[in-house]
Amino acid sequence: MAYHWPPDARAFLGYWPEPGDEPAAAIQREPVLLLSPDGAIVRGIWWTPPAGTPWRTAVVLSHPRGDFSVHYACPLLAAAGYAVLGFATRYVNNDTDCLHENAVVDVLTAVRWVREAQGADAVVLLGNSGGGSLMALAEATAPEALGDAFVALAAHPGEGVFMLQVIDPSVTDEADPFSRDPALDLYDPANGWRPWPEPCSYDPAWVERYRAAQRERVARIDAIAKESIVERDEQRAHSRTLVRGGDEWRDARQRGVHARYLTIYRTLADPAYLDLCIDPDDRTMGTVFAFPDPMDANYGFAGLARVMSARGWLSTWSGLSSHAAMADTLPAVTVPSLFVHPTGDTEIRMRQAEGLHAASGAADKAYVAIPGAAHYLTGRRREALDVVVDWLRPRVP
């Protein structure tokens, strides 16, 4: 792969390979276009070992919205002798209406292709970041085992669980991005805030109230989303009882197909970004979503779940409604499982990573920490993938 990389530059998408990740081996790449049973397009890149190198195991990785066809793990695993399908789901780069249940169909499509079309003897499901909960949901809900092994690499407990951790609970009016309850304001000096880059100090009792209020805000958004879906279903049913073409029928018909969209302000406000005494580990202050002040991520462009359909919110970003929560799915993932956690991760706490390992239903499971490494494992990727490869060698051909 040809790189045109200015000195000291970094990719906006942290999971992209960097020049230092390029293996010496002449690995092969082939674009792949698959069609899911329900007609969705699944695009990816099929990475294979150098020409003439036989392989028997395929690694499959994806993410609900990220394009993992170019994930840093792909070339390193191919150089180690595995075929790799990194792919993007139907929701690539836009999870506004992301239904994890549909993304699972895309995972099934990818696994079927590597087994049936490419002849893989074994399949490894690799879940990185938000891909961990997607792969675990796919494995847990499949009628029979999808993979022969499961790897969680810097995986968080689920996108909805993550939202419970980062949503700003001080919002008092969902229509007003500047509404706030001062008692819950992360940026109020009375609560322990100091301007970046000074460290903040939040009282543990205040943090406990903050966490409870985060759940309450998610519950309020859930209620709005669920109400809109109920109303839509009721109007759809009502339209079927009316004479077609009339004013009442037309109104009910429109309401019966209406898709409610939610604008959700301030979704990146974890006190642990600013106070390293909260769940202490090896992380630095800040978040991968802002450079450098986390306040910019909470109030500024992009962010997470800022505009969502009602059903997309409930399926993906609600920590109270989404089924893609690894604490719920991992007990059903019984294939050999490896959990690799970078202890300098600003987004995933060590207790969470250890909790995933504990929740796993696999009899053969392992937990490995990469001391001091950050979420995207920049500068430590070869080390992390060596851990994965060493663990896979005795378990898959």
Language-model features: locations:
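Acidic catalytic loop of the alpha/beta-hydrolase fold
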Residues: 159, 344-348, 375
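Short beta-strand/loop motif that positions the catalytic acidic residue
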Residues: 333, 339-341, 345
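Alpha/beta-hydrolase-fold enzymes
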Residues: 146-287
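N-terminal cap/lid segment of alpha/beta-hydrolase-fold proteins
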Residues: 2-57, 379-380
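Catalytic histidine-centered segment of alpha/beta-hydrolase-like enzymes
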Residues: 373-385
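Catalytic nucleophile-loop/oxyanion-hole region of alpha/beta-hydrolase
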Residues: 65, 90-124, 162
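Conserved alpha/beta-hydrolase
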Residues: 74-94
